[in-house]
């Protein structure tokens, strides 16, 4: 997923809006049979980019979806990614009040893969 890698570079450079576009393009180009863990990683990174870009409600939904997917697959967030995740969660939780965050998180946890992709590309 070249676009996912480009998104990661943009995010690390502080170019959140550009990272969002790369991740959305990567999701739009998914094909049947793509690796579920790789797809989950793109959602995770897109959530971080959205949080950095100030799109907190959408970020909360996608981070919740990614967390549920990781849990379902038995995958733990790698230590190298934890600081990025915590930073995104701090931004999201700081921007949304508790009812907004709770609602967005519940929506994300309830998404299926198709709904998450559609919501990510169109949000």
Stretches found by the model and what they are:
Residues 2, 19-26, 59-69:
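Tetratricopeptide repeat
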Residues 5, 12, 38, 45, ...:
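"A position-specific structural signal for the A-helix of alpha-solenoid helical repeats
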Residues 14, 24, 49-54:
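Extracellular beta-rich repeat passengers
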């Amino acid at each position: 997923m070249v676009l996912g890698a480009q998104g990661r570079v943009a995010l690390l450079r502080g170019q959140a809006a550009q990272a969002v576009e790369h991740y959305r393009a990567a999701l739009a180009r998914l094909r049947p049979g793509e690796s579920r863990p790789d797809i989950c990683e793109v959602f995770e990174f897109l959530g971080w980019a959205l949080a950095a870009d100030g799109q907190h409600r959408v970020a909360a939904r996608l981070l919740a979806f990614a967390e549920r997917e990781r849990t379902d697959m038995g995958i733990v967030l790698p230590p190298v990614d934890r600081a990025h995740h915590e930073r995104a969660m701090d931004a999201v939780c700081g921007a949304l009040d508790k009812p907004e965050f709770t609602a967005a998180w519940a929506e994300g946890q309830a998404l299926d893969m198709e709904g998450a992709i559609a919501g990510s590309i169109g949000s």
